[in-house]
A protein has these predicted regions:
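Ligand-binding clamshell of periplasmic/extracellular solute-binding protein-like
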Residues: 54-65, 83-147, 160-170, 184-194, ...
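C-terminal lobe and pocket-closing loops
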Residues: 119-121, 286-297, 309-412
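Glycine-centered hinge/linker elements that transmit conformational signals in sensory
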Residues: 195-199, 234-262, 305
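Extracytoplasmic/periplasmic solute-binding protein
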Residues: 153-161, 166, 176, 191-236, ...
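Conserved N-terminal structural module of periplasmic/extracytoplasmic solute-binding proteins
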Residues: 8, 12-119, 137-139, 182, ...
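Conserved C-terminal helix/tail region of periplasmic/extracytoplasmic solute-binding proteins
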Residues: 176, 182, 255, 364, ...
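Hinge/lid segment of periplasmic solute-binding proteins
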Residues: 37-43, 112-167, 192-196, 202, ...
Length: 444
């Protein structure tokens, strides 16, 4: 359900181009920063060490902020957070309302933003952000692919939080029934995976991989190849060779019964829990859904995803989903906000050690993988130290540019792959249609 909520929020939060309003927005950045400096000085004089935060999910994001507050209070006993729960759609609405009205006084000091919403909001509403590039946070300690989501023109606007690294979770018992091992599926190409998967399908009578339909898996495959649908701010669909290979592979695997598509999310999850599939490729957050089937403990394993054959720079790594912390232009004490974020989510292994077992939050902070907590074996995954492996995967994810048009790209590619899979439509023709659709939507 977390994943479903994420997808709905992302699609609701991304939208069309609003360049006409950017000039006023840039003016608002300057004015807002001037106001922030004066308010910050007043706040420091009064000795107030309270920051307001907007985020959602009491057991995940809010819990994380509460633990970060406790850690920071060890050296700053007067520090407090005023954490205000808002679902993401409401946060996005409030941010856009503030930006369009030019009144930023309603914004909190810190807010959580879905990663795929950053580029759109930075482009259309830059006045809501305080830039973090010179905040003192060491961004080199976070994965390149994750950072790209909240970075624009070389400037940082978000501090990465949870990890959406792509995994391939497979049923080890079904793999063994085919005379194979889990290790056989590590570091494969898609052609190698295809041959292995055929054996698993034949031995167990179920598809190798469940897909939630649409273009989610396509986007992960494309990113793993180091390719993007946007290049230098322009749509790059029609002549995108990596995307064409991705669609060809996906279509072939569906036709061969290796991938089974589910358009209903509950049925998609049930396919894993009920033994109707031998695996799944998705962001690592899918693990919580897999683990709902307690009777399958010890029967699952995690490996990296296959990579595209014949593509220079192709990898076995991608990312799907996640969120990052941002500081608003209305922050009343930017120095305090910067130091709090730097000292907690930006550097505290202690914090991430708490969040993993108690909230299920896997870090995007690379050094967290070296801690004892991340090295602990998981009984559910047959004794594998899955969290260490996942953070390692995240460190190898290529950067991926969807610009400000993520939802438009998802929609266009979903239409394209649906026509290819269900109607045997020509791939080149569908890519051209997607290109034209995106260019029209962006220009209008």
């Amino acid at each position: 359900m977390l994943a479903a909520t994420m997808i709905v929020s992302v699609l609701a939060g991304c939208g069309g181009n609003q360049n006409e309003g950017n000039t006023n927005e840039k003016e608002n950045v300057t004015n807002s920063n001037e106001d922030t400096q004066s308010v910050s000085a007043e706040t420091n004089e009064n000795g107030d060490e309270t920051l307001t935060v907007w985020c959602w999910d009491p057991t995940f994001n809010i819990y994380a902020m509460e633990q970060a507050e406790k850690i920071y209070q060890k050296d700053h006993p007067d520090f407090k957070l005023d954490i205000q729960e808002n679902i993401y759609n409401d946060i996005e609405t409030k941010l856009i309302t503030a930006a369009t009205s030019g009144d930023y006084s309603t914004l909190p000091d810190i807010f959580l933003m879905q990663d795929y919403s950053f580029h759109k909001n930075i482009a259309n509403f830059p006045g809501i952000f305080t830039e973090l590039t010179d905040s003192g946070i060491d961004f080199s300690q976070f994965t390149e692919g994750k950072l790209a989501d909240s970075t624009a023109e070389g400037k940082n606007y978000g501090l990465p939080f949870d990890n959406g690294a792509t995994i391939m979770a497979i049923r080890s018992d079904m793999v063994e029934a085919a005379g194979l091992t889990v290790d056989d599926f590590k570091d494969t190409t898609w052609s190698q995976f295809e041959e292995l998967a055929k054996k698993v399908v034949e031995a167990n009578g179920v598809p190798m991989i469940a897909s939630s339909g649409g273009s989610e898996l396509l986007m992960e495959m494309l990113q793993s190849a180091g390719a993007s649908p946007i290049v230098d701010g322009k749509v790059h669909i029609a002549d995108n060779e990596a995307l064409k290979k991705t669609m060809e592979v996906y279509k072939k695997l569906v036709d061969e019964g290796i991938i089974a598509e589910y358009t209903d999310w509950d049925q998609y999850i049930a396919s894993m829990n009920d033994g109707k599939t031998a695996g799944v490729i998705n962001g690592c957050w899918i693990m919580s859904s897999i683990q709902a089937a307690e009777d399958q403990s010890g029967k699952w394993a995690i490996v990296n995803m296959p990579k595209l054959d014949g593509v220079d720079g192709a990898t076995n790594y991608a990312n799907c989903g996640g969120a990052s912390w941002a500081v608003s232009s209305n922050c009343k004490n930017t120095e305090l906000a910067f130091d709090f974020l730097k000292s907690t989510f930006g550097s505290s292994v202690e914090l991430y050690d708490d969040l993993l077992p108690n909230a299920g939050a896997i870090a995007s902070y690379i050094p967290a993988a070296q801690s004892d907590v991340y090295n602990q074996a998981s009984d559910f995954y047959g004794g594998q130290a899955v969290y260490k492996d996942i953070v390692g995967y995240a460190g190898s994810v290529p950067a991926f540019d969807c610009g400000a048009y993520y939802s438009d790209i998802i929609s266009a590619l979903t239409d394209a792959i649906t026509n290819v899979v269900q109607n045997n439509a020509d791939i080149d023709g569908e890519m051209n249609n997607a290109q034209e659709t995106l260019e029209f939507n962006i220009e209008n």
